[in-house]
Amino acid sequence: MIISAASDYRAAAQRILPPFLFHYIDGGAYAEHTLRRNVEDLSDVALRQRILRNMSDLSLETTLFNEKLAMPTALAPVGLCGMYARRGEVQAAGAADDKGIPFTLSTVSVCPIEEVAPTIKRPMWFQLYVLRDRGFMRNALERAKAAGCSTLVFTVDMPTPGARYRDAHSGMSGPNAALRRYWQAVTHPQWAWDVGLNGRPHDLGNISAYLGQPTGLEDYIGWLANNFDPSISWKDLEWIRDFWDGPMVIKGILDPEDARDAVRFGADGIVVSNHGGRQLDGVLSSARALPAIADAVKGDITILADSGIRNGLDVVRMIALGADSVLLGRAYLYALATHGKQGVANLLNLIEKEMKVAMTLTGAKTIREISRDSLVQNAEALQTFDALKQNNAA
């Protein structure tokens, strides 16, 4: 199969992966309206073409939390990454490290902190949820600090799991789920050999290390369902801010007032995100939410964005709408499932090339030069953004 875009990796991953795994990353909450709008709204943002600008010395380099990045991207935290390729977190982290961008390890990774961190030169980032088991949270933070993790990404948009109807149909959950997953595994031999047999153990590495016993997929579903904490408030984050002496990023911001609260709290960054459309269906896409948030807090806090980014043009669009950098999630997981570390490396190279084309043809020589001026101001999508900003201000 010829791979020329992230969409090609998605098609390849669908053939390789058992359906319960493919649809787990590909699907969203409820009827998946927000999942679709994430991609559609971002692709509707019209770039402003400029010509004859002497773009010979173009640079994608940027600085984020005092780290030099080869381009304004990082790999997002993705749960169960090690189920998509053999020791998937290690492979993805290696590709990010080689490219000169950060890798973020999920709380619910297959490979534990201690397995991934020693394999890369750049300090990785670590993602954590607010959970009922505060002992686990403290244990995870201590281990992340000991492993040299530089930045804490704190996910706050999961006080309760989203309803993902597709999971019940795919075998991730629902009737006879374990039997259905077994049958899917044996009928997908490439995955069964590479990951099913040779990618063991299939533990939730960070949780197993804390509990002192092996964990599996059923434990993942049950443990998280019992540990998400709907009583979470800003006060619950204070001890974490005191404990963690590195950059702290709040992930899951969609409203300007919440962004202002993050500034008042003392966070170093926010991620404008709807969890990839996997939590509350019907909320704004990240692309629609971002401009008003940027207007509210740009310059007071570092702004990252995710959800819907599928290529380098989307990265440029998000930065033009107000982000300082972006997180890549689904796109890199499709590539990882297809060709492992090399797939992720190739995807990052594709995104880099696409960014260079977009920047060359919009007249932005550096990341700092990408702004609202890089967009067509009277495009339909931007008119919608302006209307939303006016409604938020009213």
Curated annotation (Swiss-Prot):
Q: What is catalysed by this protein? A: (S)-lactate + A = pyruvate + AH2
Keyword Oxidoreductase part of the UniProt annotation: yes
**What are the residue boundaries of the FMN hydroxy acid dehydrogenase domain, all occurrences included?**
1-380
- Membrane topology per record: Peripheral membrane protein
Q: Name one Pfam family in it.
A: FMN_dh
Residues bound to FMN? 106, 127, 155, 251, 306-330
Give its localization.
Cell inner membrane
Gene3D superfamilies recorded: Aldolase class I
**Active site: which residues?**
H275 (proton acceptor)
Gene Ontology process terms (BP): aerobic respiration; lactate metabolic process
Q: Which GO terms describe its molecular function?
A: FMN binding; L-lactate dehydrogenase activity
Q: What class of enzyme is it?
A: oxidoreductase
Could you tell me which InterPro entries the record lists for this protein?
Aldolase_TIM (IPR013785), Alpha-hydoxy_acid_DH_FMN (IPR012133), FMN-dep_DH (IPR000262), FMN_HAD (IPR037396), FMN_hydac_DH_AS (IPR008259), LldD (IPR020920)
Q: Which cofactor does it need?
A: FMN
Where, in this chain's numbering, is substrate bound?
Y24, Y129, R164, R278
NCBIfam families (alphabetical): L_lactate_LldD (NF033901), PRK11197.1 (NF008398)
PANTHER family recorded: L-LACTATE DEHYDROGENASE, S -2-HYDROXY-ACID OXIDASE-RELATED
The family classification in the record reads: Belongs to the FMN-dependent alpha-hydroxy acid dehydrogenase family.
Q: What does this protein do?
A: Catalyzes the conversion of L-lactate to pyruvate. Is coupled to the respiratory chain.
Q: What is this protein called?
A: L-lactate dehydrogenase
What are the top taxonomic ranks of the organism?
Bacteria, Pseudomonadati, Pseudomonadota, Gammaproteobacteria, Enterobacterales
